[in-house]
């Protein structure tokens, strides 16, 4: 025993184990290898030693001359002689860490997949194409536009094409035409690129490839590094196929973050290590659809930058080597040897608390948003009845007789239709030529008459086929997302001829071509900008050293949250191209991606239609059709709206609809006026096209002929004669006309350059009609709104409810969630933070129905003051424009065990809403300016007489005559701003009370200062939306004008002629006694005098190389205005009743025509809301630019609280907001938007930011989660409520006064005569 005790204190190992590193020099001396070997020596130095095989010896010397070692670490890489290493192992028989013979398996992707399959490891479905390989027969590949066939197996796009050899990293991903086609080409990283997008969609024709089914993994790749069967370290990175940009750290290494592996994935790692015989082995995981797929096995690889991984690996390998030799030599295992690690993946820490936008202290857990798509082109379609046998052959080719219709969107299908259209155009031209020959040669009157009729028919058909050809040839290529052809089978039928004879017609095809409705460039930029701004909803950056850091003004906190896999993001979109493209552009801005949208769309955006998530309900659509018929008749009455009409058409008393009805007065006369404007537009396009060079096109390459046909179709379908020969108007076409006029004024303003007065009036008239028609198509009475909304939104509500439940359950068993491993992370201050985000992009119908559920679903108590303010605010919203957002934010206060009455709920929800873009038209901008000019020192609130300019016009009055009569009085109205005073005439026609000082007005007009006070007549809960608008609207950014001159110059403000009452936008002052206040007319528009017009230099630039002299002047005057603020508040207002000729004021009436002509020259720019990133707030003595996304004005009652606004200039640094957002946020914790310096954008870029987005208004900030869950449950259960009978026709198109008085009310005619059977039985 004594001998043994003495021996235990002595060295029990006779010699050290030698580890030999046999690999190419760049691998053997890499940073990870050196770090790991150093750790092994540190931990096990008394038992092991190591050396590196010289590269020259490996390459040039025979294996007999290679140095000896006990343990060999060897692996294949480029130029490594694997066969010599295998021969060395056979010769010397060392202990091998990674099996060298099995490394050949890793070089062939076919073998890799076979081994995975044999071991039951999930992997993508795949097929092989072999070409030109010895001893292997070539396989067959058949390529189609949107799929391929490999040995009889079909792979639909998107699919992945990889070379058979694992050494070849040129991997291609092919996309379907439905998302734009093309391919993403991946390669070994070169500088900061790992892939690029190519428009080519054809697969490679040379070489051998493996084709895999594409697995969308939300733009994330997971790399797993296994060390032995019981240890695996996982890191995630941005997928190289997403945008191709490589994110690198300060050391030049690709940025990756450790993530948690599920138990199943750990088992996969164990299986791979054992199946491939590789102790150190890396492989790639794709997580999708609740599963994890192995798409590649890389063999020997180390983590690049993890110190903890180096230590763990050193202990595992060192322990394994020592124990192997101790066992093989019967040596004693050292008792003091370091033990291998067991990685703890527990999540024990509490998540960090943050301050919510409303001021509460809680942790953000979940964000759910429903967002409407961005700005689009007008949707269009044309119909043709065809009997040509070639179309029947096409119909049969695509199995049309099975369903009696076909839909064609694929490029090859559209090309077939295009070829037929081209052939038919040529044939019709030939037929026309022959008819003209007959006409010239004809002698008899009957023969000439017949030839003339045939010629007319032939030319009409030729025009239709030319239009179809033109539409199909637009853009020069087919993408599959912007055009669609349908063909429906029409059976044989009998028709009556003109002489009452029955004639049997054979079968025919109804050919329907649909185009338009695609996202515009502006819509793309709006979505991307909103994505960038959306980052600021999330927690900001927190420093790891505990020191304070600057406020996160660019959403960097979100980017870090997402890139470090503490953010679970899913984006869903309905199947319309504009919706999916909006979602992709939003994701691009949200995640700071680069490059084309197609790869982003394919990898980040999920189709919501696969499970009917955003589908429409069939019965709801039928019911809406009946509502359209009701509205069609109700808005045909040739009389002013009566009080009864207000009750029937607007039973909920929405301010926006009431204001629109007051504007319209007589709906039939308004329809006549609108029809006259549409007809005028048709003539304007013809005139415009005659003054332009041949081949000139409008926005997005729309030809003049297509634009003319677009408006002619609107006129033809809107104004038509019924079977009695009476003119009637199709009210259902009002939304289409509104889309068209809004689109042309936004994107084709040159069309209106000499007719701005008429088309301003047209826009306002059509908008007010649309403000009635569009929301009422989703229900008129509350019960109708609710039933339709439940039918449409139930699938979405179920999904949202499921999102909330899964977020709160926080199951660790979610296999597909890529989540940061907090135990292995470094340099992250809040590793336990985790946020779940679900974004749903959809069209207008889901927005309207969802908002109806929120309004009328009894979410909150009627006594809730916050909810009252929110409903008052929503009552004034006239439209849910492009990019409308409904956002739910779930917060948790982890300090509370459960919902307690005294401490409040553990989980609460904040509801935010934005109506999207500002209305794009000038009138809305003028209204903003008008309100800015009403100062706090004015003792009377601005009013407007409803009798002024509001009388119904005669049906026969033309648009021009109705405006000309008002011109002289308005042309005298001129507002002139000087550096010292603002002269404001008394405006009887507009009833505007305007007075100010120059500096304060300059600030106010740009949204920098708000000085409107609350009078004793105002209601406490008045919600004047205008007060929330802080918008810098710049005129003439194209080096033509500047809105503020230099200090010694005069900048003039002139009221432009609109000749029309303006529309009611939300909160346009009709609160309290609002029935007595009319809808104010179009007001001010910035223009300039001749001095400014002639100036054409860089001082007019708002941004760019000229450093923005305009901006500097504006900000200088703003600062002076603020400095003089206290003096201005006590001074009486300066009101000059009429313009007086002087050096600083007055515009003579004789100059009116010259000014009007001058304004017309610059008219295209006046129609755009040019917004600059001028975000003002005082930081010390200078100007600090900042911006905000969230407003709490509605929530706090500050929205319209003029007493609070009075001193707003004192709180100037609190953060006024411009660009995309509008409302002054009350809470200092509200997240701020991106900060832009003036040189960040060029003038051209700024001009494309219009119209701006409205801020997210906080509707409620303290809804208990259980309360909201109960609300959703009620709505989902009530979705099977049968639809009530639609309202019957309330009024004929024309009735006598007596008949009108006897007409029953809607309540009387809307008796339920039957119930539609529910689609399914209740539970």
Curated annotation (Swiss-Prot):
Pfam families for this protein: His_Phos_2, PPIP5K2_N
Give the family from UniProt: Belongs to the histidine acid phosphatase family. VIP1 subfamily.
- Region annotated Disordered, chain positions: 933-1022, 1043-1107, 1134-1155
Where is this protein found?
A: Cytoplasm, Cytosol
Function as written in the Swiss-Prot or TrEMBL entry = Bifunctional inositol kinase that acts in concert with the IP6K kinases to synthesize the diphosphate group-containing inositol pyrophosphates diphosphoinositol pentakisphosphate, PP-InsP5, and bis-diphosphoinositol tetrakisphosphate, (PP)2-InsP4. PP-InsP5 and (PP)2-InsP4, also respectively called InsP7 and InsP8, may regulate a variety of cellular processes, including apoptosis, vesicle trafficking, cytoskeletal dynamics, and exocytosis. Phosphorylates inositol hexakisphosphate (InsP6) at position 1 to produce PP-InsP5 which is in turn phosphorylated by IP6Ks to produce (PP)2-InsP4.
Q: Which UniProt keywords apply?
A: ATP-binding, Cytoplasm, Kinase, Nucleotide-binding, Transferase
User: Which segments carry the region annotation Polyphosphoinositide-binding domain?
Assistant: 355-426
Native source species: Caenorhabditis elegans
Domains as described in the record: The N-terminal kinase domain produces inositol polyphosphates. The C-terminal acid phosphatase-like domain binds inositol polyphosphates and negatively regulates their accumulation. The C-terminal domain reduces the amount of inositol pyrophosphates in a dose-dependent manner in vitro.
For this protein, the Enzyme Commission number is 2.7.4.24
As one GO molecular function, the record gives: 5-diphosphoinositol pentakisphosphate 1-kinase activity
Principal location: cytoplasm
The biased composition feature labelled Polar residues covers 933-947, 977-992
Q: What are its GO cellular component terms?
A: cytoplasm; cytosol
Q: Per its record, how is this protein called by name?
A: Inositol hexakisphosphate and diphosphoinositol-pentakisphosphate kinase
């Amino acid at each position: 025993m004594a001998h043994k005790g003495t021996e235990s204190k002595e060295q029990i190992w006779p010699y050290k184990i030698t580890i030999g590193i046999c690999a190419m020099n760049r691998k053997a001396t890499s940073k990870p290898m050196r770090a790991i070997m150093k750790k092994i020596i540190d931990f096990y130095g008394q038992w092991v030693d190591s050396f590196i095989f010289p590269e020259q010896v490996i390459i040039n010397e025979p294996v007999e001359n290679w140095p000896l070692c006990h343990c060999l670490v060897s692996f294949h890489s480029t130029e490594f002689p694997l066969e010599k290493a295998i021969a060395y192992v056979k010769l010397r028989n060392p202990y091998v860490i990674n099996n060298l013979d099995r490394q050949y398996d890793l070089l062939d992707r076919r073998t890799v997949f076979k081994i995975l399959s044999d071991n039951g490891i999930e992997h993508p479905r795949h097929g092989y194409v072999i070409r030109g390989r010895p001893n292997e027969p070539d396989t067959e590949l058949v390529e189609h536009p949107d799929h391929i066939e490999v040995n009889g197996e079909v792979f639909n796009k998107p699919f992945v094409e990889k070379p058979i050899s694992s050494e070849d990293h040129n991997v291609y991903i092919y996309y379907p035409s439905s998302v734009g086609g093309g391919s993403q080409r991946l390669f070994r990283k070169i500088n900061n690129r790992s892939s690029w997008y190519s428009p080519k969609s054809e697969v490679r024709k040379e070489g051998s490839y493996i084709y895999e089914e594409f697995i969308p993994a939300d733009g994330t790749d997971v790399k797993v590094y296994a060390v032995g069967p019981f240890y695996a370290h996982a890191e995630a990175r941005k997928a190289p196929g997403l945008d191709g940009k490589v994110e690198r750290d300060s050391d030049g290494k690709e940025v990756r973050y450790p993530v948690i592996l599920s138990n199943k994935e750990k088992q996969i790692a164990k299986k791979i290590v054992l199946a491939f015989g590789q102790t150190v082995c890396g492989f790639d995981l794709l997580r999708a659809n609740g599963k994890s797929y192995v798409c590649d096995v890389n063999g020997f690889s180390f983590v690049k930058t993890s110190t903890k991984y180096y230590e763990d690996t050193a202990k595992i390998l060192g322990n394994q080597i020592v124990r192997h030799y101790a066992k093989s030599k019967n040596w004693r295992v050292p008792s003091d040897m370091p033990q291998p690690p067991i990685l703890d993946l527990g999540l024990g820490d509490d998540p960090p608390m943050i301050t919510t936008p409303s001021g509460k202290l809680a942790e953000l857990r979940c964000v759910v948003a429903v967002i409407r798509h961005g700005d689009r082109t007008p949707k269009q379609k044309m119909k043709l009845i065809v009997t040509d046998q070639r179309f029947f052959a096409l119909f049969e080719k695509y199995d049309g007789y099975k369903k009696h219709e076909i839909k064609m969107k694929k490029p090859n299908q559209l090309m077939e239709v295009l070829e037929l259209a081209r052939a038919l155009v040529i044939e019709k031209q030939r037929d026309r030529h022959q008819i003209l020959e007959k006409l010239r040669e004809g002698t008899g009157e009957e023969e000439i008459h017949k030839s003339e009729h045939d010629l007319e028919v032939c030319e009409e058909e030729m025009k239709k086929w030319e239009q179809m050809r033109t539409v199909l040839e637009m853009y020069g290529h087919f993408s599959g997302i912007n055009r669609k052809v349908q063909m429906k089978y029409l059976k044989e039928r009998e028709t009556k001829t003109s002489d009452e004879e029955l004639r049997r017609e054979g079968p025919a095809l109804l050919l329907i071509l649909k185009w338009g409705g695609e996202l515009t460039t502006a819509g793309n930029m709006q979505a991307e900008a909103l994505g960038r701004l959306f980052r600021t909803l999330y927690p900001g950056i927190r420093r790891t050293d505990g020191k304070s850091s600057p406020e996160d003004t660019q959403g960097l906190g979100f980017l870090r949250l997402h890139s470090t896999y503490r953010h679970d993001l899913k984006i869903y979109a309905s199947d319309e191209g504009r919706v999916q493209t909006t979602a992709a552009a939003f994701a691009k801005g949200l995640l700071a991606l680069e490059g084309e949208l197609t790869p982003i769309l394919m990898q980040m955006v999920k189709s919501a239609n696969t499970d009917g998530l955003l589908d429409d309900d069939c019965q709801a659509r039928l019911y809406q059709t009946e509502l359209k018929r009701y509205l069609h008749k109700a808005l045909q009455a040739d009389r002013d709206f009566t009080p009864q009409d207000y009750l029937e058409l607007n039973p909920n008393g929405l301010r926006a609809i009431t204001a629109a009805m007051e504007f319209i007065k007589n709906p039939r006369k308004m329809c006549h006026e609108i029809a006259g404007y549409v007809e005028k537009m048709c003539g304007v396009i013809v005139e415009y096209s005659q003054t332009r060079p041949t081949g000139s096109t409008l926005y997005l390459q729309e030809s003049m002929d297509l634009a003319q046909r677009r408006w002619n179709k609107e006129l033809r379908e809107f104004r038509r004669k019924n079977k009695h020969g009476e003119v009637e108007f199709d009210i259902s076409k009002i939304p289409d006309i509104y889309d068209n006029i809004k689109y042309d004024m936004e994107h084709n303003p040159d069309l209106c350059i000499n007719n701005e007065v008429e088309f301003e009036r047209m826009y306002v008239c059509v908008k007010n009609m649309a403000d009635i028609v569009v929301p009422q198509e989703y229900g008129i009475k509350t019960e109708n709104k609710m039933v339709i909304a439940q039918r449409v939104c139930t699938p979405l509500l179920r999904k949202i409810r499921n999102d909330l439940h899964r977020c709160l359950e926080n199951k660790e068993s979610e296999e597909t969630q890529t989540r940061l491993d907090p135990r292995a992370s470094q340099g992250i201050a809040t590793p336990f933070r985790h946020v779940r985000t679900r974004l749903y992009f959809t069209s207008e119908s889901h927005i309207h129905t969802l908002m109806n559920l929120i309004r009328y679903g009894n979410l909150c108590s009627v006594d809730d003051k916050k909810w009252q303010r929110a409903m008052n605010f929503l009552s004034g919203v006239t439209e849910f424009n492009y990019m409308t957002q409904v956002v739910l934010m779930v917060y948790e206060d982890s300090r509370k065990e459960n919902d307690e009455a005294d401490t409040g709920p553990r989980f609460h929800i904040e509801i935010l809403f934005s109506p999207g873009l500002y209305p794009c038209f000038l009138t809305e901008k003028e209204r903003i300016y008008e309100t800015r000019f009403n100062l706090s020192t004015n003792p009377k609130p601005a009013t407007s007489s409803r009798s002024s300019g509001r009388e119904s016009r005669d049906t026969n009055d033309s648009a021009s005559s109705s405006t000309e009569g008002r011109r002289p009085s308005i042309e005298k109205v001129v507002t002139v701003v000087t550096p010292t005073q603002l002269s404001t005439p008394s405006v009887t026609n507009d009833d505007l009370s305007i007075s100010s000082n120059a500096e304060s007005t300059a600030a106010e007009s740009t949204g920098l200062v708000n000085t409107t006070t609350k009078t004793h007549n105002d209601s406490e809960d008045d919600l004047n939306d205008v007060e929330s608008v802080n918008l810098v609207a710049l005129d003439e950014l194209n080096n033509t004008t500047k809105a503020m001159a230099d200090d010694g110059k005069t900048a003039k403000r002139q009221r432009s002629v609109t000749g029309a009452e303006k529309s009611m936008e939300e909160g346009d002052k009709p609160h309290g006694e609002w029935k007595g206040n009319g809808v104010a007319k179009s007001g001010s528009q910035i223009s300039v005098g001749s001095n400014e017009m002639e100036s054409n230099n860089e001082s007019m630039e708002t941004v760019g190389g000229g450093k923005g002299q305009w901006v500097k002047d504006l900000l200088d005057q703003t600062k002076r205005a603020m400095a003089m603020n206290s003096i201005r508040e006590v001074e009486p207002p300066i009101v000059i009743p009429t313009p007086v000729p002087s050096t600083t004021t007055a515009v003579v009436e004789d100059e009116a025509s010259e000014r009007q002509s001058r304004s017309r020259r610059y008219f295209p720019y006046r129609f755009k809301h040019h917004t600059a990133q001028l975000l003002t707030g005082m930081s010390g003595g200078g100007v600090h630019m900042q911006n905000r996304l969230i407003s709490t004005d509605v929530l706090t009652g500050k929205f319209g609280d003029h007493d609070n606004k009075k001193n707003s200039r004192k709180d100037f640094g609190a953060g006024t907001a411009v660009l995309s957002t509008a409302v002054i946020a009350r809470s200092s914790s509200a997240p701020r938007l991106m900060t832009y310096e003036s040189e960040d954008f060029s003038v051209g870029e700024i001009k494309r930011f219009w119209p701006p987005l409205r801020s997210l208004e906080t509707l409620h900030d303290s809804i208990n989660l259980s309360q909201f869950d109960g609300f959703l449950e009620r709505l989902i259960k009530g979705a099977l409520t049968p639809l009530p009978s639609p309202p019957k026709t309330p009024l004929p198109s024309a009735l006598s006064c007596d008949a009108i008085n006897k007409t029953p009310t809607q309540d009387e005619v809307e008796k339920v005569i039957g119930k539609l059977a529910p689609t399914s039985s209740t539970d």
